[in-house]
C-alpha cells in the first residue's frame, strides 16, 4: 500500500475554542468525499460553498464553508478540502470523525507540508520555514521566517550551487581531454579565482545564516553568583516585571526561575539560579546542583558580584568552574551603594558591566552587551531564519572548498571531487539531496494540521 496515496485529515486550527475552526484534508479525487460531507452538493474549485456538514444519517453536524482546491494547484499539490465551521472542540472532533469515517486517516505531524515538499510545491528550507513562522517568538523572527518561506534563503543556496556546477563542469572537462595539461587548463580558465569567489560568497551566506539562527533559537542567559548579590533583582530588571522573589535573606532563590524576553527581535531565555555557596540545607543544595546544570546549557553566563566587596575568593572559585567555551560577563551590582558610575569596561580580559539592578542604571548597557556576546549584529533587513543543520551543512561545504583549494595543482580529479562534495552539502539544505531519516525528523516536529 502506498502510504502517500492515503487521504489525510486533521484539525488545522489551534486547540481551544474560537469563532472559526478548520478541518483540512489532502489526497486524490476528493470531490466524491466532498459530496458526502455536504449532502450531495459539489463545490466549485476555489469558490466557497456555504453548506451543512452532514453525518452518515443525513443529520447536520455543523454548517460552514467548504473550499475545494484541485491538484496540482494546492498547498500540497494534491486535492485539498477545507471545512470551515464553528470553532468548538466538540464540533471539530465530530467533523474530523466524519472525515475519518469516509475513508481519510488522521494526518501525522507535518504531513501536509511533507506532501507539499514531496510534490515539489516547496523545497526543504521553505517547508521548515512554515514551522518557523508559526513558532516565531518576535516580529523580526516572523518577518525573517516569511522571507525564507518565500524563497530568500533557497535562492542564496541555489546561486552557490549553480556557481559550483559551473566550476565542476570546467574542471571535469579537463578530465575528458587527457592530452591537455590539467593545471594549465585550469589556470587559463581562472579556476582558482572562481573558487575564491565562491568561498567569499559562501562566507557571506554563513554570516547571514548565523544571524538567522540567533533569531530563531534565541540564547540562554544564566545568572550566577553568591547569595544575595542581586541576581533576582537583575532578572526582574531585565524582564521589566516582578518575576523572581527578592528579599534581603540570603538563599531566597532555591530553584531555577526562567523568563523569556525579546531584545532587538532576539529571544532571550533568562535563568535566575540559586546562590552558590557551601550549605547543609538539602533543598538549597539541590538548587545549586541545578544551577550548574543550567550553566552547562547556557550560551552566556552573567557572573554577579556585590560591588561593595568586589571580586572575592568565592567569586574567583565560581569563575574557575565555568566552562571555558562560555562567554561570560562580570556584573558589578549595587553601584547605587558604592557611588560608581554605570557603564561597560574591559578588565583583565573580561567584559565588566557596572549597574544597579534595583535602580536600573546600567541595565540598558547590559542588554547591549548580551546581544554582542551572542554575536547579534543588530541588522535584521534581508535576514532569513536558519537552523543548526543549515549551519552545519554550510560549514562542511566551507571545509570541502578549503580542501579543494589545497588540492588545486595536485590532481584535477581530487579538485573536482571536493567541489562535488561541497555541492552535495549545500543540496542537503534545500532537500535536493537528503536521507529519508532526516526528512522524518524534520517533519515530525511540525504541528498536526501542517
UniProtKB/Swiss-Prot annotation:
Q: What GO cellular component is one of the record's annotations?
A: cytosol
Localization recorded for this chain is: Cytoplasm
Keywords, comma-separated and alphabetical: Cytoplasm, GTP-binding, Hydrolase, Magnesium, Metal-binding, Nucleotide-binding, Potassium, tRNA processing
All residue ranges annotated as the TrmE-type G domain in the record: 218-375
Q: Which residues bind GTP?
A: 228-233, 247-253, 272-275, 356-358
Q: Which residues bind Mg(2+)?
A: 232, 253
Q: Does the keyword rRNA processing apply?
A: no
Q: Which GO terms describe its biological process?
A: tRNA methylation; tRNA wobble uridine modification
Cofactor (UniProt): K(+)
Does the UniProt entry include the keyword DNA-binding? no
**Entry binding sites for K(+):** 228, 247, 249, 252
| InterPro entries, alphabetized | G_TrmE (IPR031168), GTP-bd (IPR006073), GTP-bd_TrmE_N (IPR018948), GTPase_MnmE (IPR004520), MnmE_dom2 (IPR027368), MnmE_helical (IPR025867), P-loop_NTPase (IPR027417), Small_GTP-bd (IPR005225)
Free-text cofactor note: Binds 1 potassium ion per subunit.
The UniProt record lists the EC number as 3.6.-.-
The residues listed in the UniProt record as binding (6S)-5-formyl-5,6,7,8-tetrahydrofolate, with positions renumbered to this chain, are 24, 82, 121, 450
Q: What is its main location?
A: cytoplasm
Among the GO molecular function terms of this UniProt record, one is: GTPase activity
> NCBIfam families, alphabetically?
mnmE_trmE_thdF (TIGR00450), PRK05291.1-3 (NF003661), small_GTP (TIGR00231)
Subunit annotation:
Homodimer. Heterotetramer of two MnmE and two MnmG subunits.
User: What family is reported?
Assistant: Belongs to the TRAFAC class TrmE-Era-EngA-EngB-Septin-like GTPase superfamily. TrmE GTPase family.
Q: Outline what the protein does.
A: Exhibits a very high intrinsic GTPase hydrolysis rate. Involved in the addition of a carboxymethylaminomethyl (cmnm) group at the wobble position (U34) of certain tRNAs, forming tRNA-cmnm(5)s(2)U34.
Q: Which PANTHER family match?
A: TRNA MODIFICATION GTPASE GTPBP3, TRNA MODIFICATION GTPASE GTPBP3, MITOCHONDRIAL
Q: What is this protein called?
A: tRNA modification GTPase MnmE
Amino acid at each position: 500500500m502506498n502510504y502517500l496515496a492515503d487521504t489525510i485529515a486533521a484539525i488545522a486550527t489551534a486547540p481551544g475554542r474560537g469563532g472559526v475552526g478548520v478541518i483540512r484534508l489532502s489526497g486524490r479525487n476528493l470531490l466524491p468525499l466532498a459530496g458526502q460531507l455536504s449532502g450531495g452538493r459539489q463545490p466549485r474549485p476555489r469558490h466557497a460553498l456555504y453548506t451543512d456538514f452532514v453525518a452518515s444519517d443525513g443529520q447536520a453536524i455543523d454548517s460552514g464553508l467548504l473550499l475545494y482546491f484541485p491538484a496540482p494547484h494546492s498547498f500540497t499539490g494534491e486535492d485539498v478540502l477545507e471545512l470551515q465551521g464553528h470553532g468548538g472542540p466538540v464540533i471539530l472532533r465530530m467533523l474530523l470523525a466524519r472525515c475519518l469515517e469516509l475513508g481519510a486517516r488522521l494526518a501525522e505531524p507535518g504531513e501536509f507540508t511533507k506532501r507539499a515538499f514531496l510534490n515539489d510545491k516547496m523545497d526543504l528550507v521553505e517547508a521548515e520555514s512554515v514551522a518557523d513562522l508559526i513558532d516565531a517568538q518576535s516580529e523580526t523572527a516572523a518577518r525573517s521566517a516569511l522571507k525564507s518561506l518565500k524563497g530568500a534563503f533557497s535562492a542564496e543556496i541555489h546561486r552557490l550551487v549553480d556557481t559550483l556546477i559551473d566550476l565542476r563542469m570546467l574542471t571535469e572537462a579537463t578530465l575528458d581531454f587527457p592530452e591537455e595539461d590539467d593545471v594549465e587548463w585550469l589556470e587559463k580558465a581562472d579556476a582558482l579565482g572562481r573558487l575564491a569567489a565562491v568561498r567569499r560568497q559562501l562566507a557571506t551566506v554563513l554570516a547571514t545564516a548565523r544571524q538567522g539562527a540567533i533569531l530563531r533559537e534565541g540564547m540562554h542567559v544564566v545568572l550566577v553568583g553568591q547569595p544575595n548579590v542581586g541576581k533576582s533583582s537583575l532578572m526582574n530588571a531585565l524582564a521589566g516585571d516582578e518575576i523572581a522573589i527578592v528579599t534581603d535573606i540570603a538563599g531566597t532563590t532555591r530553584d531555577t526561575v526562567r523568563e523569556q524576553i525579546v531584545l532587538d527581535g532576539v529571544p532571550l531565555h533568562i535563568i535566575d539560579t540559586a546562590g552558590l555557596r557551601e550549605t547543609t540545607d538539602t533543598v538549597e543544595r539541590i538548587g545549586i546542583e541545578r544551577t550548574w546544570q543550567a550553566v552547562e546549557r547556557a550560551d552566556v553566563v552573567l557572573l554577579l558580584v556585590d560591588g561593595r566587596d568586589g571580586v572575592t575568593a568565592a567569586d574567583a572559585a565560581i569563575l574557575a568552574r565555568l566552562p571555558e567555551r562560555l562567554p561570560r560577563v562580570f556584573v558589578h551590582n549595587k553601584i547605587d551603594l558604592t557611588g560608581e558610575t554605570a557603564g561597560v569596561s574591559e578588565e583583565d580580559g573580561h567584559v565588566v558591566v557596572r549597574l544597579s539592578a534595583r535602580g536600573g542604571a546600567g541595565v540598558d548597557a547590559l542588554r547591549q552587551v548580551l546581544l554582542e556576546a551572542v554575536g547579534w549584529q543588530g541588522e535584521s533587513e534581508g535576514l532569513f531564519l536558519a537552523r543548526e543543520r543549515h549551519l552545519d551543512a554550510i560549514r562542511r561545504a566551507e571545509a570541502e572548498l578549503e580542501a579543494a583549494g589545497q588540492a588545486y595543482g595536485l590532481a584535477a580529479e581530487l579538485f573536482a571531487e571536493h567541489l562535488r562534495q561541497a555541492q552535495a552539502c549545500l543540496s542537503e539544505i534545500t532537500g535536493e539531496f537528503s536521507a529519508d531519516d532526516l526528512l522524518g525528523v524534520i517533519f515530525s516536529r511540525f504541528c498536526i494540521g501542517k
